[in-house]
């Protein structure tokens, strides 16, 4: 790490990431050159070709009427960063891509808890992607850039925050892997954290604040080849491996802030508005504790919420005159008291608000085939959380086309998550998905990607929709379970079923033998209230053998390694229980729905693709019209043929093979052909796609002379014909076959041979 003033007012700090045999990556932060009117601005570079600008600004006046912290994070992808013009109609960037939205969430999650409580000034962080090597990912660079610019803005911010992607490649955890290296990775995770002190050996003590992780789509293949499986212990090792890299990035950001003079800013000009005064909390506690403690033992969410709202109304009525004009403080103090009672009961009694023990899972239910015409459907319930999963299969050409700075250009598996307001018994806006819905859908998608069959094994585009019909804790992990069930119901040959569970953590200082010690209690299958009042939201999805996806957010300054390892082990026990319940509903792929298309794959020579398509698509369109099948051709000669019934698909395949993989007809073969052209000298009949024969006018009259071909046949007529001759140039001469001749030939083929007949008569 190094820091320098490269020119007057321009400062630069560098962190070098050493990956051993995988080489080094250099992260460089620069301030003082671009966006100087922002409160804080930083240009972050990854090696030489990746360049991001982050600017942090704050409103002059606080929004005192807000009861939340108004932080906004935006990521602006500029297509010029990759030397491209946007593909939209207006040829300029529009709404943010899914990659940009997910990066916004990655930045927001560790940054938000790093601000002081009670801040009400509007804070906006805008990260603009200026240059990007197509072999690199920008999301983790954006986390560091956003943290660095916020650190320079003089805000009441307890950063800096460092973010790193580490991937398990050839048994080593590699930081900032590129796209090419990720092709060989077993597991990949983004980890963010900050330095909170110093270890006994003098190394920085890093508190992990956020984790977003997943197994790669090649994990099963790599593990079968000898790579380590991403088990709970391996994932825990990866989290520890990320800490030195985070420390280096945080140190570089701090050095930049020190050199530029930003650390001299105290943030005193930004007032803090406590949610309530101590006097209000004391009054609320005095009148509400007993009744609220009793209400929090009610098992049902609706009944419990109704009773707590009644108590809250009683408290407001009793204290309204004493604390006139401070009703919002009374409400905030009531919430704080609720949080204290919930946490106290968990830590001291290991008992939860719905009566469960700390490792108990709510009642589970799973069933499939609920939606009649859907290709696959399932309902998964865990307590009051209810998820409907619906699967739709289609041709591979229906894969999503992606126009963003990410490495993906198409997406064959699309997972969409919907969270309507009625799922929590409320009213609200419905319509286009919000960032939270996009994030939850992406998490469920990543959990299932490692077990999906390849396009060669299952040549379909797959759309999975998760409908959150009821919510009381981790609808995203419920979506993973419902999706596994629906995919199996649709006939998708998953490599293994996947289930997910949400874990929580509550910590407090307790007196033990006259000493105060920190006690951590890990909760299995958290409720919505336990998520809101707890210290950690830890979602883990996986098969019975390994983890496929993981998401962690914590409000603590670090979680001990043994606590995290224990949470992972506890999550596995719960996952295995859920998988057993799911297996009772369905454990192998069902037969495909009669409403789903049957897709068959064939190969044609690349030089025959043009012939199959025909001029302006004439040939392929005619095959589609005649057979009713859908046809999609890839550049490598792979042809996908889809139809709702087998005969239609086979008819299309036969026609394609006749063009691209032809077998020449022989003299004596009979066909039911279509007249495609008439001339003065005869009628051309299509025998196979791309292969016609001529019935001469002299052969059309059945022994009688005719003056005009159209007097006997017209274009579109069906004729039963036989190949009479094929000349040296391949031209085919045809003769008509009478229907009775054809029937006689068929009967002769079915009758016994003469020798057999003689034997029978004797």
UniProtKB/Swiss-Prot annotation:
Residues 668-737 form the S1 motif domain. CDD domains: KH-I_PNPase, RNase_PH_PNPase_2, S1_PNPase. Its cofactor is Mg(2+). It catalyses: RNA(n+1) + phosphate = RNA(n) + a ribonucleoside 5'-diphosphate. Keywords: Cytoplasm, Magnesium, Metal-binding, Nucleotidyltransferase, RNA-binding, Transferase. Its main location: cytoplasm. Mg(2+) binds at residues 531, 537. It comes from the Bacteria. It is an enzyme of class 2 (transferase). Its EC number is 2.7.7.8. Residues 597-656 form the KH domain. GO terms for cellular component: cytosol. One of its GO terms (molecular function) is 3'-5'-RNA exonuclease activity. Signal peptide: none annotated. Pfam families: KH_1 (PF00013), PNPase (PF03726), RNase_PH (PF01138), S1 (PF00575). Involved in mRNA degradation. Catalyzes the phosphorolysis of single-stranded polyribonucleotides processively in the 3'- to 5'-direction. Belongs to the polyribonucleotide nucleotidyltransferase family. This is Polyribonucleotide nucleotidyltransferase. It comes from Mycobacterium marinum (strain ATCC BAA-535 / M).
């Amino acid at each position: 790490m190094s820091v320098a003033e490269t020119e007057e007012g321009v400062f630069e700090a560098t962190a070098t990431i050493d990956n051993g045999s995988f080489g080094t990556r250099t992260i460089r932060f620069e301030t003082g050159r671009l966006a100087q009117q922002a409160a804080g601005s930083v240009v972050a570079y990854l090696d030489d070709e990746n360049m991001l600008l982050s600017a942090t600004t704050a409103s002059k006046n606080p929004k005192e009427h807000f009861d939340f912290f108004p932080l906004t994070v935006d990521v602006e992808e500029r297509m010029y960063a990759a030397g491209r013009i946007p593909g939209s109609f207006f040829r300029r960037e529009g709404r943010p891509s899914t990659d940009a939205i997910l990066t916004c969430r990655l930045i927001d999650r560790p940054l938000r808890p790093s601000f002081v409580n009670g801040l009400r000034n509007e804070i906006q962080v805008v990260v603009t992607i200026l240059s990007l090597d197509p072999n690199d990912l920008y999301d983790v660079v954006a986390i560091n850039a956003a943290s660095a610019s916020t650190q320079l803005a003089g805000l009441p911010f307890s950063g800096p925050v460092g973010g790193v992607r580490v991937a398990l490649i050839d048994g080593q955890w590699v930081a900032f892997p590129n796209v090419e290296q990720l092709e060989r990775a077993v597991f990949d995770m983004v980890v963010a954290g900050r330095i909170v002190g110093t270890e006994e050996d003098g190394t920085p003590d890093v508190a992990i604040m956020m984790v977003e992780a997943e197994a790669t789509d090649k994990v099963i293949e790599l593990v079968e080849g000898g790579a380590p499986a991403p088990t709970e212990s391996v994932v825990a090792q990866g989290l520890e491996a990320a800490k030195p890299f985070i420390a280096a990035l945080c140190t570089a950001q701090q050095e930049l802030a020190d050199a530029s003079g930003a650390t001299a800013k105290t943030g005193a000009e930004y007032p803090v508005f406590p949610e309530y005064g101590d006097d209000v909390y004391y009054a609320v506690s005095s009148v509400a504790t007993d009744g609220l403690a009793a209400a929090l033992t009610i098992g049902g969410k609706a009944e419990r919420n109704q009773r707590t709202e009644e108590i809250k109304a009683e408290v407001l009525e009793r204290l309204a005159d004493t604390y006139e004009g401070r009703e919002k403080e009374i409400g905030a103090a009531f919430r704080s008291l609720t949080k204290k009672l919930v946490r106290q009961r968990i830590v001291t009694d290991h008992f939860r608000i719905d009566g469960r023990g700390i490792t108990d899972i709510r009642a589970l239910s799973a069933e499939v085939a609920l939606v009649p015409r859907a290709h696959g459907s399932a309902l998964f319930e865990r307590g009051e959380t209810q998820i409907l999963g619906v699967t739709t299969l289609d041709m591979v050409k229906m894969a999503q086309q992606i126009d963003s700075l990410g490495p993906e250009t198409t997406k064959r598996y699309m997972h969409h998550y919907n969270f309507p307001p009625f799922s929590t018994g409320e009213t609200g806006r419905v319509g286009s998905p919000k960032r939270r819905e996009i994030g939850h859908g992406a998490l469920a998608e990543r959990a299932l990607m490692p077990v999906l069959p390849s396009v060669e094994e299952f040549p379909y585009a797959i759309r999975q929709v998760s409908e959150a019909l009821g919510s009381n804790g981790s609808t995203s992990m419920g979506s993973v379970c419902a999706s596994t069930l629906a995919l199996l119901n649709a006939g998708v040959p998953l490599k293994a079923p996947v289930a997910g569970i949400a874990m929580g953590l509550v910590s407090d200082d307790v007196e033990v033998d006259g000493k105060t010690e920190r006690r951590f209690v890990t909760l299995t299958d958290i409720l919505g209230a336990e998520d809101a009042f707890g210290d950690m939201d830890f979602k883990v999805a996986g098969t019975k053998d390994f983890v496929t996806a993981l998401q962690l957010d914590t409000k603590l300054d670090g979680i001990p390694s043994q606590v995290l390892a224990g949470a992972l082990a506890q999550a596995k026990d719960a996952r295995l229980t859920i998988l057993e319940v799911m297996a009772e509903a369905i454990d192998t792929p069902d037969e495909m729905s009669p409403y789903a298309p049957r897709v068959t794959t064939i190969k044609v020579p690349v030089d025959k693709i043009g012939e199959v398509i025909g001029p302006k698509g004439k040939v392929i369109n005619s095959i589609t019209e005649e057979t009713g099948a859908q046809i999609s051709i890839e550049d490598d000669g792979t042809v996908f043929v889809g139809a709702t019934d087998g005969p239609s698909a086979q008819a299309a395949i036969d026609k394609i093979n006749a063009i691209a993989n032809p077998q020449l007809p022989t003299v004596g073969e009979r066909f039911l052909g279509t007249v495609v052209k008439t001339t003065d000298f005869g009628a051309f009949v299509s025998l196979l796609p791309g292969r016609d024969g001529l019935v001469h006018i002299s052969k059309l009259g059945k022994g009688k002379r005719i003056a005009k071909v159209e007097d006997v046949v017209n274009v579109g007529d069906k004729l039963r014909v036989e190949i009479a001759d094929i000349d040296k140039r391949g031209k085919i001469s045809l003769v008509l076959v009478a229907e009775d001749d054809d029937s006689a030939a068929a009967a002769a083929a079915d009758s016994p041979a003469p020798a057999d007949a003689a034997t029978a008569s004797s």
